[in-house]
Design a protein with these regions (language model features):
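Acidic/polar-rich alpha-helix caps and helix-coil junctions
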Residues: 1-77, 87-89, 99-275
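Extracytoplasmic segments of membrane-associated envelope/inner-membrane machinery
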Residues: 95-96
Length: 275
């Protein structure tokens, strides 16, 4: 943890607090870090995810299998994308996300999606329409065990997207141009022949790119909630039995998780969240 990682995390915190001036100022500082951190290039993008402390990594937890109990132990993001999740169909990529990414067949981020290595061993839920795809963003350092994959807490791509969102919300010609430049740094990295035009810049477009770029990193739900947007869960191979979309709005009581019963028992003044 260093000054750059703290400033990067603060850019996220202030974005969540809707303090866009501070979020943008801190994001700019991190982006102008003197070359210590750099965005992945288009060509290296498919191969960087299992490595320690990549050029984008501002803060990550280090894991190794060379020491006793040195792996993740199933905690954090890496484990949920392992081959041994087989019938955990709540952990596969949603059809809605793959349809979104499929809008551009040449997007380099397709390289991080794969079918199971042994589909004949996968257990498909009743009514599923084909094998699900897993996210291969956490392949492990040797490529065969995700439990030694480091967990990246924040990386430079997110900082660029934080800056894009904060600058857009602040408005004004200079901020809008900067927002577009930050957004296109991510869009054109994914596909060098693609870019967002000035007339296409919107909060919806920025959030769409956040969803594509930061998939599997724990942002999409909170991005929707903090912007007053609903999340729609539709059927597919992960929820084949859902006939109608399950919509969760920011005011939905399910947004606040239940307080553990042990905490309720220990404090008679504790009021349980509605759920």
């Amino acid at each position: 943890l260093n000054v750059w990682s703290v400033k990067a995390l603060l850019s996220r915190v202030y974005l969540y607090m809707n303090d866009n001036e501070k979020a943008l100022a801190l994001a700019k500082e991190v982006m102008n870090n003197g070359g210590l951190y750099q965005l992945f290039t288009h060509d290296e993008y498919p191969t960087v995810w299992g490595k320690d402390f990549s050029s984008e990594s501002l803060f990550e937890f280090y894991y190794t299998l060379s020491e006793p109990d040195g792996g993740t132990g199933g905690e954090g993001a890496p484990m949920v994308y392992a081959d041994n999740v087989k019938d955990w169909n709540n952990l596969v990529l949603t059809k809605a996300f793959l349809d979104l990414l499929g809008e551009d067949p040449d997007d380099v981020r397709h390289s991080l999606n794969r079918l199971p290595e042994k589909p004949e061993e996968d257990i498909l839920p009743e009514g599923s329409k084909g094998y699900p795809k897993y996210l291969n963003k956490y392949p492990g350092k040797t490529g065969d065990n995700p439990q030694d994959n480091d967990i990246c807490i924040i990386r430079l791509s997110e900082v660029y997207l934080n800056a894009a969102e904060a600058a857009f919300k602040l408005g004004g010609a200079e901020n809008l141009k900067f927002s577009l430049d930050c957004l296109n740094a991510i869009v054109s990295r994914a596909n060098p022949v693609k870019s967002v035009k000035e007339t296409e810049l919107s909060l919806e477009r920025i959030l769409k790119e956040r969803r594509k770029e930061l998939v599997g990193e724990g942002h999409a739900f909170f991005d929707a909630m903090r912007n007053g947007l609903s999340v729609s869960r539709t059927g597919g191979w992960h929820l084949p039995s859902v006939a109608a979309a399950v919509v969760i709005s920011p005011s939905d009581p399910r947004v606040a998780l239940p307080i553990p019963q042990a905490e309720i028992d220990a404090n008679p003044n504790m009021v349980q969240n509605p759920h």
